[in-house]
């Protein structure tokens, strides 16, 4: 399972459905991966918080394997975004991080766990929500 930023933020914020989904994945023994661009987004957000928030993010991220952006994944991300933009006449509105997350999902043939369903569906990858 590829964990998107939206899921991890909801999990950190104590959102019940996110917690229950995380518990389900743990109970099932599912591998939960965090793409490195998600780490970037979380670190950016935490930088605006206090030391407790920064520590909480660092500690939480230690629980998951981080998938680095390789050349292959980066190229796939570009193709996924280009296809989504072409399908939407150049106006998909998808940011640059979501295709990088989607490319990791494509590489591992795993769904993205997110609250941001529409963008990931437009990128053509499997999606789960909570």
Model-predicted regions and their roles:
Residues 7-8, 38, 73, 101, ...:
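Alpha-helix capping/helix-boundary segments
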Residues 1-34, 46-59:
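Short, well-structured N-terminal submotif of metal-dependent ribonuclease cores
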Residues 42, 95-111:
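Acidic, metal-associated active-site segment
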Residues 64-65, 124-130:
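Active-site regions of enzymes building and remodeling cell-envelope glycoconjugates
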Residues 65-85:
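Acidic catalytic patch
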